[in-house]
Regions:
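C-terminal motif of bacterial Sec signal peptides marking the signal peptidase cleavage site
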Residues: 20-23
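Compact, glycine-rich, soluble single-domain proteins
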Residues: 25-176
């Protein structure tokens, strides 16, 4: 009976060690499969790229609204965006810059705070706004037309500040 118990314990230990090694290998394999220079968006605590911060302002019926925005203008920065952040200072946001205007769609994977997603056309006008996008929701939130830029600000701020489709966004990316 004692030998049977020892065999059972040994089998359980070996099985546990084997499963642990498989999990490590799977994680390492996934990391190794990620292209060089890309952020692994599935990593639970992916390292945030170093974003440059620049001024941006919106010309609306309510007047001039100033923001400091982090710039996401390459694939790694655009893929990471505001994921894993739990807060954002008032008057701050992130501007995603794309090489050409086209229909865009964003989601809220690994995003802890609600956001207003503001789609901006090549003419610097707001095309559409997806207001109060829900944290962690992976539903695609599309633009209502081609967009070359996407501004993310804290959820509810666009309505609170009177920002609407048709308003003009001023930033260097629009030659302003």
């Amino acid at each position: 009976m004692r030998d049977a118990r020892r065999s059972l314990v040994l089998a359980a230990v070996l099985l546990g060690a084997s499963l642990g090694a498989s999990a490590c290998t799977a994680r390492e394999g996934a990391a190794a499969a990620a292209p060089a220079g890309k952020v692994d968006i599935n990593a639970p605590h992916a390292t945030s790229p170093d974003f440059v911060t620049e001024p941006l302002w919106i010309e609306s019926a309510a007047g001039r609204i100033d923001y400091r925005v982090e710039i996401a203008d390459d694939d790694a920065e655009r893929q990471h965006g505001l994921m894993f952040r739990t807060s954002m200072p008032d008057g701050h946001g992130m501007l995603f810059i794309f090489p050409q205007a086209r229909p865009q769609a964003f989601w809220m994977r690994n995003t802890y705070m609600p956001l207003d997603i503001i789609y901006i056309g090549a003419d610097s006008r707001i095309v559409s706004i997806q207001a109060n996008a829900r944290p962690f929701d992976e539903t695609a939130l599309p633009s209502e037309g081609p967009a070359i830029g996407v501004l993310e600000i804290y959820g509810g701020k666009a309505a609170q500040q009177g920002i609407k489709p048709g308003d003009r966004v001023h930033h260097r990316m629009f030659g302003q």
